[in-house]
Amino acid sequence: VHMARNMXVPPXXAD
């Protein structure tokens, strides 16, 4: 589940 670490990260850079 990488969505949990993208909380603050905008799409694109959130890998």
Swiss-Prot record:
Transmembrane segments: none annotated. GO terms for molecular function: NADH dehydrogenase (ubiquinone) activity. The lineage of its organism: Eukaryota, Viridiplantae, Streptophyta, Embryophyta, Tracheophyta. It is a peripheral membrane protein. Its main location: mitochondrion. Complex I is composed of about 45 different subunits. It is found in: Mitochondrion inner membrane. Keywords: Membrane, Mitochondrion, Mitochondrion inner membrane, NAD, Oxidoreductase, Translocase, Ubiquinone. It is an enzyme of class 7 (translocase). This is NADH-ubiquinone oxidoreductase 12 kDa subunit. Its EC number is 7.1.1.2. It catalyses: a ubiquinone + NADH + 5 H(+)(in) = a ubiquinol + NAD(+) + 4 H(+)(out). It comes from Solanum tuberosum (Potato). GO terms for cellular component: mitochondrial inner membrane. Transfer of electrons from NADH to the respiratory chain. The immediate electron acceptor for the enzyme is believed to be ubiquinone.
